[in-house]
C-alpha cells in the first residue's frame, strides 16, 4: 500500500512517522520500500522511520541506514525448553503427529502448536491427530484440533482463538487440550494465547521463481535459524513452554541458514521494476536496494560502462540501459544480497515484450497505465487491452480469479465428489457461475448451498467480483 502511495506522493508527505514491523522477513515489498525510504529521508529531515523486528540483523540494517541508533526492548518471554531428535526423521509429518499424541498423553495441560507446510499436510494431520487421540478413549482428555492456513475462510480461522474443550466428566475429569496445526503464518503474524508446546519439523513452503523457464513454484524448503527461534518463542508467551524440534541439534547449527533467504532473490521482479519505473527510478543499478551493491561496486560498474572495454555480442544487441544487468554477473560475488541478475533481465524483457518499456528502457504510455493496477504485468496488460475487444467485464472477473487462491474446495472425505463437480465445469463456466451467483445473492441473500454443492469456496467467490460488480 505504501509503495503505491509513493507513486502519487513521492515524499510521503502525509506521514511523519513510518513504522516497518517484522523487517527480518525481508519481503519483496519491504526491501524495495527500504530503498525508497532511504531516498526520502535525504529530502525530509522531519520524517522518522522505525524498523522493528524480533530477529533483526541489527548491524546490517544500521549500516544500511547510515549508522541509525539501535534500541533493544527487553522481551517478556517465559523460558522455553528445546528438545531435538537423536536422529533425522524420515517422515516429518508422521513424526509431528506422533509427538502431538505423546504430548497429549504425557504432558501437563497446555495447548499445542504444530507447524506444517501447506493445506494438504495440515488437513491430513488434523484427521490423523483426531483419529489417534480418539482411539485412546477416556484415558486422555478431549482434544480440539484446529487448522490454520491462508486459504481457510475467515470464520474458520477465528477458531484458533477458541478455548480448549472442558473435561468430559466436569471439573474432576482429565482436562482437554487445543491443537493448532498451522503454516508459518503463526510464526509472527499472530499470537495464540494458551500455547505451551510447539512442534517444529523445520520446513516451510517458499515461492521460488525460475527465470530460465519463467515459472514460479512453491517448494518445501528448510527454515532458517531465525524462523526456528520465532517458532520456539510461540511456546513461551503466557508461561514456561517446550519446543520439540524434529531435527537434530547438529542440523540446526550446521545446515540451517542464519536468516531467511530474502524474497527479492527468489521472486519474479516484473511488478517491482514496473513500480520503480513509475516512481522515476530508471537506473536500477544505482537504486539503493536493501540487498544491493556496496558503493565501491557501483563505482566499478560506472567505470565499466564508461570504458572502451570490448563487449560480448549479446550485450551489443541489448539496449544500452540493459547492460548493467548483465554486468551483475561479474560483480555478484562482491555484493551483499543483490537481486538475481537473470531475474532482473527477464523482468525487463517481459516489460519490453508487453509494451510497458520501450527499447531504451523508458516507461511507455501503456506502461504508465499498467503500473496503476496492483497486478502482475501480464494481467495488467490484459486489463488494459480488454476495451479494444469489448470484453472488459469478463476480463475483470478472470483477473480477479487469477489474483486470489484456488476457488475449489476438496474436503479429504469428499475428494471424489469434489473432483466430479469440478470436471463438470469448462473454462468459461466459472466466470459465468461467479456472475450468476451474484444475481442469486441479490435475490435471495444467500447462496452458500449453491456454491458448496459445486465445491467452490463462497468467500473466495466473493473476492472474484470487483466492488463495482457487487453493488
Language-model features and meaning:
Residues 1-382, 389:
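P-loop NTPase motor module signature
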Residues 302, 307-314, 318-321, 327-329, ...:
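Acidic, serine/threonine- and proline-rich low-complexity intrinsically disordered segments
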Amino acid at each position: 500500500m505504501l509503495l503505491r502511495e509513493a507513486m502519487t506522493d513521492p515524499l510521503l508527505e502525509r506521514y511523519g512517522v513510518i513504522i516497518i514491523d517484522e523487517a527480518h522477513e525481508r519481503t519483496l515489498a519491504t526491501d524495495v520500500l527500504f530503498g525508497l525510504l532511504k531516498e526520502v529521508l535525504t529530502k525530509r529531515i522531519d520524517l522518522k522511520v522505525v524498523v522493528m523486528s524480533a530477529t533483526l540483523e541489527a548491524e546490517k540494517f544500521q549500516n544500511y541506514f547510515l549508522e541509525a541508533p539501535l534500541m533493544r526492548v527487553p522481551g517478556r518471554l517465559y523460558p522455553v525448553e528445546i528438545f531435538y531428535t537423536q536422529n533425522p526423521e524420515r517422515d516429518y509429518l508422521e513424526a509431528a503427529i506422533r509427538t502431538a499424541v505423546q504430548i497429549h498423553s504425557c504432558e501437563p495441560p497446555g495447548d499445542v502448536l504444530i507447524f506444517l507446510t501447506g493445506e494438504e499436510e495440515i488437513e491430513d494431520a488434523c484427521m490423523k491427530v483426531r483419529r489417534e487421540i480418539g482411539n485412546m478413549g477416556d484415558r486422555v482428555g478431549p482434544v480440539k484440533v484446529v487448522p490454520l492456513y491462508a486459504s481457510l475462510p475467515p470464520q474458520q480461522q477465528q477458531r484458533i482463538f477458541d478455548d480448549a474443550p472442558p473435561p468430559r466428566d466436569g471439573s474432576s475429569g482429565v482436562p482437554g487440550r487445543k491443537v493448532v496445526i498451522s503454516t508459518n503464518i503463526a510464526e509472527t503474524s499472530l499470537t495464540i494465547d494458551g500455547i505451551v508446546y510447539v512442534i517444529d519439523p523445520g520446513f516451510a513452503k517458499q515461492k521460488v521463481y525460475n527465470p530460465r523457464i519463467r515459472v514460479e513454484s512453491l517448494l518445501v524448503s528448510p527454515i532458517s535459524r531465525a524462523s526456528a527461534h520465532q517458532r520456539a518463542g510461540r511456546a513461551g508467551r503466557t508461561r514456561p513452554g517446550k519446543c520439540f524440534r524434529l531435527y537434530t541439534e547438529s542440523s540446526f547449527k550446521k545446515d540451517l541458514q542464519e536468516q531467511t533467504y530474502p524474497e527479492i532473490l527468489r521472486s519474479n521482479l516484473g511488478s517491482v521494476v514496473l513500480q520503480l519505473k513509475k516512481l522515476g527510478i530508471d537506473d536500477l543499478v544505482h537504486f539503493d536496494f536493501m540487498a544491493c551493491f556496496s558503493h565501491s561496486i557501483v563505482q566499478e560498474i560506472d567505470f565499466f560502462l564508461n570504458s572502451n572495454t570490448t563487449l560480448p555480442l549479446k550485450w551489443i544487441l541489448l539496449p544500452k540501459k540493459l547492460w548493467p544487468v548483465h554486468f551483475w554477473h561479474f560483480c555478484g560475488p562482491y555484493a551483499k544480497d543483490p537481486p538475481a541478475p537473470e531475474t532482473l533481465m527477464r523482468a525487463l524483457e517481459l516489460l519490453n515484450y508487453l509494451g510497458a518499456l520501450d527499447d531504451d528502457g523508458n516507461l511507455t504510455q501503456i506502461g504508465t497505465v499498467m503500473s496503476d493496477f496492483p497486478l502482475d504485468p501480464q494481467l495488467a496488460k490484459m486489463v488494459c487491452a480488454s476495451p479494444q475487444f469489448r470484453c472488459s467485464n469478463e476480463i475483470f472477473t478472470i483477473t480477479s480469479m487469477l489474483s486470489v487462491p484456488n476457488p475449489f474446495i476438496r474436503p479429504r472425505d469428499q475428494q471424489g465428489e469434489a473432483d466430479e463437480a469440478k470436471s463438470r465445469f469448462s473454462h468459461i463456466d466459472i466466470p459465468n457461475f461467479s456472475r450468476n451467483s451474484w444475481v442469486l445473492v441479490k435475490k435471495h441473500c444467500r447462496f452458500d448451498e449453491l456454491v458448496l454443492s459445486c465445491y467452490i469456496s463462497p468467500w473466495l467467490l466473493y473476492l472474484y467480483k470487483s466492488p463495482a460488480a457487487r453493488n
